[in-house]
């Protein structure tokens, strides 16, 4: 990965393509997990294909829901909405898996069987010039394993309870007079 100081971004190149490092981009987006939302970037056909994609990555098993059932596809869409440079990567990835499904199974990706979808995704992952597959995979895992419904099932299965690390702890009472000097310091920001 090379840093292009003229463009002020990291870029990774492969023969014939320049691709953006999606990890740098998605770090700028914060999407709450577990909230129902609508698709904003994808049209209905692509949204259906993305739901099938994430549900193929993490299918339903026992009490555990499929990734598509807990809003992982909508989470990917919302993340890409906040990082416009990745929209083309996602759209190209969805169009490519649909094309591969047409070639291999004779139907759209969303209409293919789970086995056909798995084969299509393996072929796509092996020759993915823009890193759409790892981007969707990483965002799917993030949305799935932080979803309250999935965490409840994991707690029932294992007894392990997830505690949100960034929620902060209880602040012990202290003498507020210790903050007197800080209250006199001028702000360190500029009003706009």
Segments predicted by a language model, with ranges:
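Mature-region segments of soluble proteins
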Residues: 1-21, 31-35, 47-48, 52, ...
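Charge-rich (often acidic), low-complexity intrinsically disordered regions concentrated
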Residues: 38-41
